[in-house]
């Protein structure tokens, strides 16, 4: 399975129940095609960068998932035929570096420290520990 991110923007005229229904529909599309949703971000109503179909605002939703490439065609088709979807994008993460970035985004969305950040913190902790030892040795020699 490959790593993907999808974001879609729904019309601002939808009521809360309709928004939840649309979100659940797209989540089910992913899971019914043997995809695994790692995490998602419900970003809520936001201003659009520019007007789309006479709308200045839209409801944003992002999902990070793993799926087979064949499922993406169906997901994009369903986005296109739904009049309530103003815009959508599906991003595929391919290279090792991109997959690491995908994991970092998932960790951030889940409010966990990312793998890269943990490595940095361990290095920083070791460095500060050595600095403290050096300072304490220097103060004893006076």
UniProtKB/Swiss-Prot annotation:
Q: Where is the composition biased (Basic and acidic residues)?
A: 110-133
What InterPro entries would the database entry show? Answer: Ribosomal_bS6 (IPR000529), Ribosomal_bS6_CS (IPR020815), Ribosomal_bS6_sf (IPR035980), Ribosomal_S6_plastid/chlpt (IPR020814), Transl_elong_EF1B/ribsomal_bS6 (IPR014717)
BP-aspect Gene Ontology terms: translation
Which PROSITE patterns does the record associate with it? RIBOSOMAL_S6
Keywords, comma-separated and alphabetical: Ribonucleoprotein, Ribosomal protein, RNA-binding, rRNA-binding
What's its job? Binds together with bS18 to 16S ribosomal RNA.
Q: Which family does it belong to?
A: Belongs to the bacterial ribosomal protein bS6 family.
Name assigned to this protein? Small ribosomal subunit protein bS6
The species this protein was found in: Helicobacter pylori (strain ATCC 700392 / 26695) (Campylobacter pylori)
């Amino acid at each position: 399975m490959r790593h993907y991110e999808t974001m879609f923007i729904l019309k601002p005229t939808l009521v809360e129940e309709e928004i939840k229904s649309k979100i659940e529909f797209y989540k089910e599309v992913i899971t019914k095609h043997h995809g695994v949703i790692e995490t998602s971000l419900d970003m809520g109503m936001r201003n659009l960068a520019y007007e789309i179909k006479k709308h200045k605002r839209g409801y944003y939703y992002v999902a990070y998932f793993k799926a087979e490439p064949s499922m993406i065609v169906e997901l994009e088709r369903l986005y296109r035929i739904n009049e309530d979807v103003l815009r959508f994008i599906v991003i595929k993460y391919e290279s090792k570096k991109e997959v690491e970035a995908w994991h970092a985004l998932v960790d951030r969305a889940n409010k966990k420290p990312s793998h890269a950040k943990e490595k940095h913190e361990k290095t920083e902790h070791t460095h500060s520990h050595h600095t403290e030892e050096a300072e304490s040795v220097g103060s004893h020699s006076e």
